[in-house]
Each structure stands twice: as structure tokens, then as C-alpha cells.
């Protein structure tokens, strides 16, 4: 049993089989073209399904994971992203609301290639913000 993040309401526990985890991992790796040269950073606990999915995909391919307990609202989180040359990160809708508030579009992150989102739909204004204001 794994916990969802609760970003669409209250947390839920889901039962996921080994086969589901394996197939999900392979599918994400293929879609995002994750390989051993890839590097991501933790933004969610590994006991959430989405957080574990990010860890599984990168470990399966021998990619790197920057493990941190820093949060996106902390300047040191972004310094770590820059110093470690992180290529991607994931977040739930609330995470992306925070990014807008802390002026993510003004940050210098030359290594960042993409970010992923799960846990519910992004509001239309957030989608537009990231489409218009990020060079990714």
C-alpha cells in the first residue's frame, strides 16, 4: 500500500503490484528518455506514489538522484539544483503554485530540461504561466 499525496483532496492509499510498478517504470523511462546521464532531485517523499515513481525510474536506469530535505521555498534548494546540474524535477499542482509565487521564471537553471506534474490538473493560469515564462 502506498499513499497518494492528497493533492486532489485527502490522501488515499493504493495497492500497487510489482508488475504495475515495473510497467509504469518502463513506460515513464521510455516517454521521458531517462538514461544513466540523467539527474533529478527529490521534491516529494518516497512514500507517495509519485515520489516513488520518480525514484524508481531513475534508479532503474542508473541515473542520479539528488536526495534532499530542502523545500522549493528555500534558496538553498535552488542553489543545490544549480550546483548539481539537475536536469528535471517533479511536483504536484500546489508545488507549481509555489514556483510561480517565488518567481521561478526568473531563476537561472541552465541544466534544467523539463519538469513533470501529477496529482491532479494544473489550473489554466498556471499552465499558461509556465508555457509563456519558462524556456524549457
Named regions from a protein language model:
Residues 16, 29, 53-55, 100-104, ...:
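Short amphipathic alpha-helical segments
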Residues 38, 44, 113:
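Nucleotide donor/acceptor-binding cores
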Residues 20-21, 45-46, 94:
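Short glycine-enriched loops at secondary-structure junctions
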Residues 44-47, 119:
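ABC ATPase nucleotide-binding domain signature
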Residues 1-26:
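Conserved AMP-binding A3 loop
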Residues 60-61, 68-136:
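Conserved adenylate-forming
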Amino acid at each position: 500500500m502506498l499513499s497518494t499525496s492528497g493533492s486532489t483532496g485527502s490522501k488515499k492509499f493504493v495497492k500497487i503490484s510489482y508488475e504495475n510498478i515495473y510497467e509504469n517504470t518502463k513506460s515513464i523511462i521510455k516517454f521521458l528518455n531517462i538514461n544513466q546521464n540523467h539527474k533529478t532531485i527529490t521534491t516529494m517523499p518516497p512514500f507517495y506514489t509519485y515520489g516513488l515513481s520518480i525514484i524508481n525510474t531513475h534508479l532503474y536506469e542508473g541515473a542520479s538522484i539528488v536526495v534532499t530535505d530542502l523545500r522549493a521555498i528555500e534558496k538553498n534548494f535552488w542553489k543545490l539544483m544549480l550546483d548539481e546540474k539537475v536536469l528535471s524535477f517533479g511536483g504536484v499542482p500546489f508545488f507549481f503554485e509555489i514556483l510561480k509565487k517565488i518567481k521561478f521564471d526568473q531563476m537561472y537553471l541552465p541544466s534544467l530540461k523539463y519538469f513533470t506534474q501529477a496529482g491532479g490538473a494544473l489550473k489554466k493560469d498556471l499552465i499558461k504561466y509556465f508555457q509563456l515564462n519558462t524556456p524549457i
